[in-house]
């Protein structure tokens, strides 16, 4: 079974970009998408992906709030979560990494940076 990546982001442009990158460079990786934190949590519980990519600003929650919910849910607590955000200030990065994020990828990112992130966690 191919590894699955769950991308929690409400931006259709970002979702399309990640889908195109995976379609070209990681055809063995299944992409699951969720536009809200609650949808993402539900999808993570049901699908148990190998990696979760999480936007820091969602319509219903912050990345930190979703990260906390994922960490406190037994079936998702061990899934690595990488925050993807345009807010890459050091205090934000430190807060999210301290809150349990396995990594942080600043927007805009390059294709090699994105692929390296996948390779690190899948």
Pin down the residues of each PLM region.
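Alpha4 helix (beta4-alpha4-beta5 surface) of REC/receiver domains from two-component response regulators
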Residues: 65, 88-103, 116
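C-terminal output helix
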Residues: 109-118
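Acidic, metal-coordinating helix/loop segments flanking the phosphotransfer/catalytic sites
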Residues: 33-51
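Conserved acidic segment of CheY-like receiver
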Residues: 2-13, 18-22, 52
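The feature encodes the CheY-like receiver
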Residues: 59, 77, 89
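Hydrophobic/aromatic residues positioned on beta-strands within the core alpha/beta folds
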Residues: 82-84
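Acidic catalytic/metal-coordinating carboxylates
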Residues: 36-39, 62-68
